[in-house]
Amino acid sequence: PIYSEGEVLSAWLNEQAAEESLPRALYYNSISLHDGNQLAGRSRMNSLESYPARQQRLFADIAQFISQLEREGRNVMLVVVPEHGAALKGDKLQFAGLREIPSPAIVSVPAAVKFIGPDIKHSELYEVEKTVSYFALSELISNAMKWDAFSGAVNVQRLVDSLPSAAKVAENQDTVMMYIKGQPYIQLDGAEWTKYPDN
């Protein structure tokens, strides 16, 4: 069992501190918010009931990890990308907690990027409001390296202004959801396209 994401991340960071300060990357797949997880020491709850507590704990663990990274004094680009939404609310096509149909609420998730380092001088939050994809994240990472985002001289707005936008499209084995003229449409099992119903 994993009782704390913070403990896992902290242990990794402590291992790195003992080694030479070479560049490194960590890909960490958090499982705190996955369906079916249970909270240790508490009575059994379904995923929707336990989600608020699990979410709060995950954000606290991430905040703790950021504080540790800041104390290290190294240059770090922290990227947090949800796999998908949690379907906390149902709609006319599926119940809360189900993700069989890639609804707009499930596939529209925020991602976060934080630059940490001794020469980082910006602290403002910049929000990208246009629809972007994983390609935009890779572009952001590339630009950060190309323009040396850790020098303290790079305007973060410059990093995000040039990100490519993307059409909102999602697909699984039997279903396709995409936006047409600003409205979500869905195709189930290869049938006719229909507008995704409003709640």
Where are the regions a protein language model picked out?
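Generic enzyme active-site microenvironment
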Residues: 80-81
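Catalytic metal-binding/acid-base residues of hydrolase active sites
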Residues: 84-85
